[in-house]
């Protein structure tokens, strides 16, 4: 009985030893991630006056929003054409995230109640924008893994196209998750971003 099991294992090894993998293996995925927090200045005696000012300042500085998280995601394959196939040597995934939020310049002169209101709003804003950032960082990780395990191609242009398809799939998934987050939180209002609907 033992010898039969050993023979089966030996035959399986012999059958797979010469087989070439259909996917690239051992590829290093190099993430290049930078997060930039930016603040735009707002002034006023209380949160209500800030809300009015941020409608205009936010429109000018944050694409019509009080706060904003924007991103860029790109990828690059380092390849080498060989006689039998395109060799994939390295994958680089580059991400740039910019988070923009208001900074209340007169906060120290405001009442304790107004400062507390502001702190709650800013905390909710950071929570909401950070959730967008976290979705993107998960997508970067997922994309790096997928690109490092692409199917082997004979032609490097075909490999680049395969990577482009994977990247588009990850981007579409990210956009869907962003949309779900916006719906689930009512654009952050359920987290405490309780501004008037027009802002």
Language-model features: locations:
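Sec-dependent signal peptide recognition
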Residues: 2-8
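N-terminal signal peptide c-region/cleavage motif recognized by signal peptidases
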Residues: 14-16
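Metalloprotease/metallohydrolase-associated module, dominated by Zn2+-dependent proteases
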Residues: 20, 24-109, 153-199
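Mature extracytoplasmic/lumenal regions of exported proteins
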Residues: 118-122, 143
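Active-site recognition of the HExxH zinc-binding catalytic motif
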Residues: 124, 128-136
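Membrane-interfacial alpha-helical segments at the cytosolic side of multi-pass membrane proteins
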Residues: 137-147
